[in-house]
Design a protein with these regions (language model features):
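Beta-strand-loop-alpha-helix segment that lines the small-molecule cofactor/substrate pocket
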Residues: 66, 77-104
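N-terminal Rossmann-like dinucleotide-binding module
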Residues: 1-45
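Hydrophobic Val/Ile/Leu positions in short beta-strands of Rossmann-like dinucleotide-binding domains
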Residues: 5-6, 69, 93
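Short amphipathic alpha-helix with an adjacent loop that forms part of the alpha/beta core around
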Residues: 53-64
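A structural motif
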Residues: 45-46, 88
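Aromatic "clamp/platform" in nucleotide-sugar-dependent glycosyltransferases that forms part
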Residues: 72
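Conserved SAM-binding strand-loop segment of SAM-dependent methyltransferases
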Residues: 46-53
Length: 104
């Protein structure tokens, strides 16, 4: 398996970081704001790419085999759509997964 993208840097993402570190997986944390990224770095000792997924994708990174989406509920749909459009096929989406029926 290639690297994993972990989208988000909040509390839930920090839990995923601990799990991925424990499993010895290679992953990239992609956060949006500097404040949450700084807090995440301090707690997990893990680097965070700041600027959000859209900005990160503009740098044309290699497609990963898996992504974990741990962002606020209002951003879930948009983030998952970006990942699918970029070609990421295996996506774990933190609940609720969607806010509206049409987002499924």
């Amino acid at each position: 398996m290639r690297d994993i993208w972990l989208i988000g840097a909040g509390v839930m993402a920090q839990d995923y970081i601990r799990v991925l570190q424990g499993l010895g997986r290679k992953f990239v944390v992609i956060g949006r704001g500097e404040e949450s990224a700084k807090k995440c770095r301090e707690i997990t000792q893990c680097g965070v790419v700041v600027g959000g997924l859209e900005r990160y994708l503009k740098s044309n990174p290699n497609i990963v085999s898996h992504a974990i989406v741990a962002v606020g509920a209002e951003s879930l749909y948009h983030v998952v759509l970006q990942l699918l459009n970029y070609g990421v096929k295996n996506i774990l989406v933190e609940k609720p997964g969607a806010l509206y029926k049409w987002q499924f």
